[in-house]
Amino acid sequence: MTRVAVIGAGITGLSSAFFIKKNYPEVDVTIYEATNRPGGKIKTEKRDGYVIELGPESYLGRKKIMTDVAREIGMNEDDIVTNQTGQSYIYAQNQLYPIPGGSILGVPTDIKPFISTKLITLKGKIRALKDLTMKPISITEDDISVGHFFRARLGDELLEKLIEPLLSGIYGTDIDQLSLMSTFPYFKSLEEEHGSIIKGMKQVRRERQKNENNNRVGAQGQFKQFKQGLYDFILKLEAWLKAREVTIEYQTTVKDLSSTQQGYNLIFENDNTIFYDGVIVATPHQVFQKWFENDPMFDYFKSLNASSVATIAMAYDNANIENYENGTGFVVSRTSQTDITACTWTSKKWPHTTPKGKTLIRAYIGKPGQRIVEDCTEEELVQIAQRDLSKVMKFQGSPDFTIVNKMIQASPQYHVGHISKIKEIQAHIYDNYQHLQITGAPFEAVGLPDCILQAQNAVEKLIPRIR
């Protein structure tokens, strides 16, 4: 019998085991997890009728692989919810500005609301519209920073006031260092195909509207979640795996890997050794890079920085809080003097998460290059969030409760050149480590469906070679 070890029980590791048992049910699978729980960054807390996400909030619905897996592990349509649509805002120049209608990731596709917005000056609007007549931007070494690309296409002002707040929060990276081809390569493809980012995104918008019309569905949110929280997905996935005789060993740390001609010996903290025909590594890069110190190809991961972020959830009685605006949340421009980077009015965006008569807010703290998350206590982070939020909202009294979740060095920073280096490393692994695959956020996109897709790809690269 072929035996495979999966190291790491986050969503990538669990999904790796899922695809092994789905497509190769005869393979014996054991998952090793250093902590006492599955799910990695996914954490949901239920309290007093609230469903509170402390890690990732949701996933992009058009990336259907996560919804497909949810159905396969026994979740039904009633378990899956879509976010409420509503106005989103940019906090800039000490006030909230509505994100102009028709904007997609900050790129204008409807000229009228873009021209009428007060967020961008007339000079900034004229500069952005030059995109319509510019030639494609040439790039060297097959990559360019997101900041460089959008500055060249749309100008500094639109980038800094609209695009940067929306994009940098996803990856926690300085936009002038963030790799375009590792994160948003389709922007470059649209530019080359249509000669303009604005024209390209207008076509994307038309296609989305056409699909909505064909499906006879009105305006819907882009994001999905689960009624009982994202962690419900993790627990059901864990149960599905256990029902198929997958063993999950918690609080078990793999200290090292030792290769043989037939596979790998896993060496544990107590120096016990267990042999496996194949191994899938789905841990943070800070963990696995030390196992390959003798291979210079893995030196890249020593210099791969990761950013920290804290989420601060605050629950209030409706009588004790006043939103100035009726919307789902806001992101903060880089020029604003705040420590929070974004805020979600969760009770409006996800009504199922909050009891009637209550308001749930989630603030985010953590900017590239800062150490505020590492250096501040949880109480200090709550005070910082309340200080910054008081600039746009009125609070009376204290919240019913607050919950802080620190995610230290949790988001790998994809700097320019990342994707070409990762492709080189992946080819090296395939050519030189027949019994091994390494996957997860250090390699490619960090969204939950992307992690599941990477797991599927890792399984299909590994299992046929070792059976």
Where are these regions (language model features)?
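Active-site/ligand-binding neighborhood in enzyme catalytic cores
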Residues: 128-252
